[in-house]
Amino acid sequence: MNLKIRLAAMNFLEFAAWGAYLTSMGTYLMNIGLGSEIGWFYAVQGIVSIFMPALMGIIADRWIQAQRLLGFCHLFSGLFMFVAAYYALTQQAHIQFGILFTLYTISVAFYMPTLALSNSVAYNALTKAGMDTVKDFPPIRVFGTIGFICMMWIVDIMGFQPNQNQFIVSGICSIILFFYTFTLPKCDTHDDGEKKSVMDIFGLRAFALFRKKKMAIFFIFSMLLGVSLQITNGFANPFITSFKDIPEYANTFGVNHANILISLSQISETCCILLIPFFMKRYGIKNVMLIAMLAWVFRFGLFGFGNPGTGVWMFVLSMIVYGVAFDFFNISGFAVCRSDYKSGTSFKCTRSVYVDDQWYRGYSGDVICSGHCECPYSNDKWDGCY
C-alpha cells in the first residue's frame, strides 16, 4: 500500500479516537448530573500534557520504537475508555465523579502523548522514503481532521451524545489503531548516552526566551486564546443542546444534532489552512495574529447572541469564523518562534508554548467556565460565559 495512504489512515484513526468524545462529553456529563465537573474532565488533558508526552518521548528515543509505543499507548487508552464506559453503563444514576474521573484520566494520560508520537512516526517514515516532510505531511495530517469530523457525525447520528457510548466508539478507534501500528514502518531508537536534566527533558529552559517583551506578549495571548479554545471544546455542545428545554427550539436541527453543527468548525479549520500563505504574505505575521484575535471575539459574540431557530445563522457563522480564529493564530504563532530564533531554540520555544497552552487553557478555561455555568439548564448564565 502507498506510504502516504498508510500514514493518512494512521492520522484518521488517531484523531477519530479523540473526536468521538471531545465535543460531546460535556453534554453527557450534564446528562448524568456532573455538569459542575465538566471543567475537570477537560482540564486533566492539559495537566497530563505537562509530563506524559515528555516521558513517552524519552522512552521512544531510548528503548521502544515510536510506532510500537504509539500502539501500546492507544491500547491502554482504549482499554480504560472501555472500562469507563462499562462503569458508567452499570452504575447509571449512581455514577461517582471520583471513579469515572480516575478511569478517564488514565485513558487521557496514555492518549495525549500519541499526538506527538504519531507525528514522529509520520516524519520518520517520510524521511526514510526520501520525501519532503514540509510538502507531503500537511495533506496527510488533514486526514486526522477528517477522522475527527467523521466520529463527531457518527456519535451524533447514532444518538451517543448524551450517553457513555461515545467512550466505546473512542475505545474501538484506539484498539484498531493499536493493531494497525504493527503494519507501520519501524522507527529506530537513538540513545546518545547524554545525560539530560529535568529542565532539558521538559523543555523548561526555553522559557528564558520569554524575557523578551515580544515573546512574553505572544506567550500571554497564546494562553488567553487557548482558554477560549478549551471553552469551545467543553461547553459548545451543552450550550446548544440546552435549548431543548425551550419549546420553540426543542425540535430544531441544531438542538438534536449539535455535534454536526459544531463540526462546521473543524471543516472551516481545514479550509482556512489554505488561506494562510496568502494572508501571511499579504498582511504579515502581526496582522494575521490580530485577525485571529478579532475572530475569537466574533466567535463567542455570535455564539452568545445566536439560537437554533431564527438565529441559527449566527451559530453557522460562528463555526466558520472558528477556522480563522484557530488556524491564523496557531500557525502565525509558530512562525513568530521560527523567525526570531535558531532552529533548535525555535523547536523548544514552540514546544514550551504548546505545553503551557495545553495545561493552562485546560485548567483555566474549563474550570473557570464550569464554575460560572454549573447548571445552565436552570439558569441564564450562558451569556456571561460567552
Question: Which role fits each region the language model picked out?
Answer:
Residues 1, 185-219, 245-250:
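Juxtamembrane intracellular "pre-TM" segments in multi-pass secondary transporters
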Residues 1-50, 214-250, 257-258, 330:
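Helix-loop boundary and gating motifs at the non-cytosolic
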Residues 12, 77-80, 93-117, 121, ...:
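Hydrophobic core of transmembrane alpha-helices in multi-pass small-molecule transporters
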Residues 40-61, 260-275:
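Central cavity-lining transmembrane alpha-helices of secondary-active solute carriers
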Residues 75-94, 294-308:
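C-terminal ends and interior cores of transmembrane alpha-helices
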Residues 105-143:
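Cytoplasmic helix-loop-helix junction between adjacent transmembrane helices
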Residues 157-173, 371-386:
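A membrane-interface helix-boundary motif in multi-pass transporters
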Residues 287-333:
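C-terminal transmembrane helical hairpin of 12-TM major facilitator-type secondary transporters
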